[in-house]
Curated annotation (Swiss-Prot):
The gene is CD1B3. PROSITE patterns: IG_LIKE. Residues 1-17 form the signal peptide. CDD domains: IgC1_CD1. InterPro entries: Ig-like_dom (IPR007110), Ig-like_dom_sf (IPR036179), Ig-like_fold (IPR013783), Ig_C1-set (IPR003597), MHC_class-I_related (IPR050208), MHC_I-like_Ag-recog (IPR011161), MHC_I-like_Ag-recog_sf (IPR037055), MHC_I/II-like_Ag-recog (IPR011162). This is T-cell surface glycoprotein CD1b3. Antigen-presenting protein that binds self and non-self lipid and glycolipid antigens and presents them to T-cell receptors on natural killer T-cells. It is a single-pass type I membrane protein. Residues 18-300 are extracellular. GO terms for biological process: adaptive immune response; antigen processing and presentation, endogenous lipid antigen via MHC class Ib; antigen processing and presentation, exogenous lipid antigen via MHC class Ib; positive regulation of T cell mediated cytotoxicity.
Length: 332
């Protein structure tokens, strides 16, 4: 039976009956990465995501589910969740076994990697779109559409063979369809409600400027750091007056340990042209009050530190003078 357990990859944690509206589409999806190093060594990663936020994991050694948020189970009971976790354990074992059993038939050579993603996405109008896709070696392989397995062009004859072998198992496709189009939407709406306070929090970004190295003589790299913001969407741009500079280079938005985000935005300029440039930051938590940092302007925090240090030096000098005077007068 060729990779029949693949369909269980669409099993999602069912719960919930309340819809929570989001301005941007948001999805719940499960991702799996299985690396077949050789016939006896296989590694896998299984995780559940709400948008860009990981809320589930699984210990690959023990098969124990990891709930990363207090609300990761949504409204699902412990008993129901235990049943789903057990299903995943069975699925992983069977998926690895069946894949290894058909390595030769599908002309796969070690090492190779299989990826998969399954879930559903809620749009602002209330529509929910479900999906299940598999990849082989980073290329699209198969997907689930209209109650059937659809081979991807990149998958070639190998993907076509997999879909042909799965085609007779109508009960399996019925189960997948039910999970994708009924179970997943129920869970998505439920977990959005359970995690509402956390998901809707607004954390203001902190921003600062620095300089970076550049390989061109006479040039300067301006770096604008933006950190500690939530939610993830943010707009950062180097500006000259009110004009956006298209040469701005935006890095990847990276996660901080506390669940907030960090972004680094750079601009390479001729050193003499850096004066008058600024970095502008827009974020939903700022209430329309953009952060604007001007290159070359002194940092207010720096002035505060300088003032404190100056005061300390003054009082130290005064104390030394005072005690010296007392000593000269014979008091000490």
């Amino acid at each position: 039976m060729l990779l029949l357990e693949l369909v269980f990859f669409a099993v999602l944690f069912p719960v919930g009956d309340t819809q929570d509206a989001f301005q941007e589409p948001i999805s719940f999806h499960i991702t799996q990465i299985t690396s077949f190093v050789n016939s006896s060594w296989v590694k896998y990663q299984l995780s559940g995501w709400l948008g860009d936020l990981q809320i589930h994991g699984m210990d690959s050694d023990s098969g124990t589910a990891i709930f990363l948020k207090p609300w990761s189970k949504g409204n699902f009971s412990n008993e129901e969740m235990s049943e789903v976790v057990e299903l995943f354990r069975v699925y992983i074992v069977a998926f690895i076994r069946e894949t290894k059993a058909h390595v030769n038939a599908l002309q796969m050579e070690y090492p190779f990697e299989i990826q998969g993603i399954a879930g559903c996405e809620l749009h602002s109008g209330g529509a929910i779109v479900s999906f299940l896709q598999g990849a082989f070696g980073g290329l699209d392989f198969v997907s689930f559409k209209n109650s059937s397995c659809v081979p991807a062009p990149e998958g070639g004859s190998r993907a076509q063979t997999v879909c042909k072998l799965l085609a007779p198992y109508h009960d399996i496709f019925y189960t997948v369809e039910k999970l994708l189009y009924e179970t997943c939407p129920q869970y998505l709406l439920g977990v959005l409600q359970a995690g509402k306070a956390d998901l809707h929090r607004q954390v203001k970004p902190k921003a600062w400027l620095s300089s970076g190295s550049t390989h061109e003589p006479g040039h300067l790299q301006l770096v604008c750091h933006v950190s500690g913001f939530y939610p993830k969407p943010v707009w950062v741009m180097w500006m000259r007056g009110e004009q956006e500079l298209p040469e701005t280079q935006r890095g990847d938005i990276l996660p901080n340990a506390d669940g907030t985000w960090y972004l680094r935005v750079t601009l390479d300029v001729v050193t003499e042209e850096a004066t008058g440039l600024s970095c502008r930051v827009k974020h939903s938590s700022l209430g329309g009050q953009d952060i604007v940092l001007y290159w070359g302007h002194s940092n207010p925090i720096g002035w505060v530190i300088l003032a404190i240090v100056s005061c300390l030096i003054f009082f130290l000098c005064f104390a030394l003078w005072y005690f010296r005077r007392l000593r000269c007068e014979g008091i000490f």
